[in-house]
UniProtKB/Swiss-Prot annotation:
This is Phosphoglucosamine mutase. The keyword Isomerase applies. The modification Phosphoserine is found at residue 98. Belongs to the phosphohexose mutase family. The active site is at 98 (phosphoserine intermediate). Activated by phosphorylation. Catalyzes the conversion of glucosamine-6-phosphate to glucosamine-1-phosphate. The gene is glmM. GO terms for molecular function: magnesium ion binding; phosphoglucosamine mutase activity; phosphomannomutase activity. Keywords: Isomerase, Magnesium, Metal-binding, Phosphoprotein. It comes from Anaplasma marginale (strain Florida). It catalyses: alpha-D-glucosamine 1-phosphate = D-glucosamine 6-phosphate.
Amino acid sequence: MNIFGTDGVRGRANVYPMDPITVLRLGMAIGLEARKVGTQVVLGKDTRISGYMVESALVSGLVAMGVNVGLLGPMPTAAIATLVRNLRASMGVVISASHNSYLDNGVKIFDSEGIKIPLELEEVLESNVRAELSSDLAQVRGMGKVYRIAGAVGRYIEFVKGTFPKRLKLSGMKIVVDCANGAAYHIGGEVFWELGADVVVIGNKPDGLNINHNCGSLHPEGMVQKVLEEGADIGIALDGDADRVVVCDEKGRLVDGDQVIASIMRHLRATKSITDAAVTTMSSKSIDSYARELGVRLHRSEVGDRHLVDTMRQHSCSVGGEKSGHIILWEHSTTSDSLVAALQILSIMLLENKSASSIFGDFVPMPRVHRDIPYSMEFDHIARLIGPTLSDVEQALGRVNGRVIFRRSGTERLIRCVIEGEDPKLVALVADELSIKLRELGVENGVEPEMQ
């Protein structure tokens, strides 16, 4: 069984592959590769209670291989990608399961350039996790040391603020920030406050168990309510490791990643020579025609931050992102950074002198239903059983420029099912029929329905 998915290693804490023995061996495997480049690895995490166990196991494996480990404590994933470059480290490691509940944890790995390691290196690490590495252990004199990196939070805050135009301030703007009780709990509000905003922060009291629980980008209802209560100009919701952002405008209307990307594309096209952008297969079909109207070439990648980055590098894209809220601004970041993306949105509002609802109003996503379906039987078996029904669905949706996506998640035991098309009634009907068929096949009903 492979331990790497679409975004590193992820699973139930204290259960393979996130059990202490496997994580220790993963630390050794990472150390074996890191020492080919240098002697330092920087290590950050989110706020899950299992982070202590995972951190200890990884550190033991790394120092046993002769690698020094700089501990960052709770920090956004993008902060590790930034600091690995800033500190000239060999690799950066993040302990996080992103938007998952506290029950899960994971490990993400960046190379010395702050880019997620390629599939080929994942395969090497996977092989070495299973290999006998005792002969590769460092001699006692050569074992690594562990130290805390002082000032890392302030250094990252200054980096994020540096992506905001120097002539602009957030004075007079009221912002609600939901930090999801996660890695940015002590950073999210500070960034906007230091730039002059009146900031209302929620989801900033982590206890190890409440990360992403009824808060953050997956549960933005609290943010929406607070925006309306406070009369705020905008609401910004992060996830557990602050690599995705979901926004609501001053009217409390939610804005997804596609709308954020569309707004940034439009602004950059009007002010800069942006020619190319990237999204994943999960993005709305209507964003393709929107990009064409702007004169921007839009490229699609497979789902996942690494695939998106590869596509952006291949086509020299200025901006890329996913519907889920992962936004990459290549001028500033090598991975998705919710705080950098949020500042980009705020700068557009200020430079265009428009409200949040106005800057997102141009792009209208195609009507869709998105369901996340838990499953227990083998996915390939489900795919074979549902195949004929999917063919019928695709034929029906083809009449309304629609499509169906039926894929397994690379980070959770869920099937991602998306039905979209220009006729919202047909989309809803097809989604219901597909759900009925899945129930007949013994697959659980979908959760978290989304209609746009």
